[in-house]
Amino acid sequence: MSRRLLAAACLMLSFSAAQAAERWETLPPTPTAVAGAKTGYAAVNGIKVYYTRTGHGSPVVLLHGGLSNSDYWGNQVKALAAKHTVISIDSRGHGRSSRDDKPYGYDLMADDVVAVLDHLKIPRADIVGWSDGAIIGIDLALRHPDRIGKVFAFAANTQTSGVKDAVEKNPTFAAFIERAGKEYAKLSPTPKEYDAFVEQISHMWASQPNWTDAQLQSIKTPILIADGDHDEAIKREHTEYMAATIPGAGLLILPNTSHFAFLQDPALFNAAVLGFLDSK
């Protein structure tokens, strides 16, 4: 091999290595809906909530992040369904679920989850949440601890100050927001109301969540606080604060991933979830 070819080969290897090291900057495609899952709607709290159900075993509810939908959990549904009954929910106004004029709030969204469990006659379930879904999981631990077992809380915040400034300008996060708008138009029962939906939920984000140390310290539910080491949205010190404040909470930082770790490295994410849920 000539020196020129050798130099070119080394340059390509270096470029490939650099690309692999920047996985956290990628936004992999949204998974397709899981084939064979039972789907349905639950009439709860004045709206219709879409859900999927598949697998056998102890129940686990998957709660997605703001602006997205339950399809984002496709890689996790497949992995969890071997040992668990997996229920994936489109939160109110997201995906295929409807919304009404009630102001958005995490208490209301947590009450929706409890109502879906009632609809499905499931007395108790573990929660796996991402971003807003993780916040809903913590809300459930605070207000409905009798209905849940464990909470895997990925990329959550418990105070508005835990969110980084101008996160929407981050290229990966901006790409997600653009994708979410297109998916809303495709899936929503009100496909032309994305801007109104975003405005409605943004009022919640301006002031919620805002839990005190005392509230977090009252939690008795087993919780694992997890995040990617390059989260675009959540401050690392806030993630560490949550884990230190909630009694008995664990802390897990997934390497080379961001706010979208479940898409970027599903094998690592799934192993972390299963390891936590199935531990004694």
Model-identified regions with their sequence ranges:
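Flexible "cap/lid" loop of the alpha/beta hydrolase fold
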Residues: I135-R143, G149-K182
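Conserved HGGG/HGGXW glycine-rich cap/lid loop of the alpha/beta-hydrolase fold
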Residues: I47-R96
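Short beta-strand/loop motif that positions the catalytic acidic residue
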Residues: I219, I225-D227
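Acidic catalytic loop of the alpha/beta-hydrolase fold
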Residues: H230-I234
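Active-site loop/oxyanion-hole signature of alpha/beta-hydrolase fold enzymes
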Residues: T54, S88-V128
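Catalytic active-site module of serine/aspartate enzymes centered on a nucleophile-bearing elbow/loop
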Residues: P255-K280
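Active-site nucleophile elbow and catalytic-triad environment of alpha/beta-hydrolase enzymes
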Residues: E199-Q215
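Catalytic histidine neighborhood in serine/cysteine hydrolases
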Residues: A243-F260
